[in-house]
């Protein structure tokens, strides 16, 4: 299954980007052994409207335009469900084993995801009730994808 990350906004060069890149590279190397191929990161321009609702709609339509029919979609959103790393690995494994060919994990803009997009997602995932900076969400997502690959392969990186 090809896995890509779609993120509203651009991540500037710096230590956060380097750390995120390091985890995504680890995932890219370890994922193929368990049928997960990292297809990269797509950055989506932030909405420019004065209204938060309009920005959500604009960003949501740009994200929607990037999705192929049949794409599995996991949205990262503070209103989502908190899962353990093992549960996330199980969910991604189920999508893979269920025949899904493409999975997009999407990081929304500052206003969150458009409600209709949340409604169509296979999973709305939260990294907890706290609000996280976009840069750290990318780092945490990269680490969790790497962890998912290690869990699915039985690698000792994840020692739960």
From Swiss-Prot:
Keyword Methyltransferase attached: yes
Cellular component GO terms held in the UniProt record: cytoplasm
Keywords: Cytoplasm, Methyltransferase, rRNA processing, S-adenosyl-L-methionine, Transferase
One term of GO molecular function: rRNA (pseudouridine-N3-)-methyltransferase activity
Principal cellular location given in the protein's record: cytoplasm
Subunit details: Homodimer.
Designated name of the protein: Ribosomal RNA large subunit methyltransferase H
Organism: Mesorhizobium japonicum (strain LMG 29417 / CECT 9101 / MAFF 303099) (Mesorhizobium loti (strain MAFF 303099))
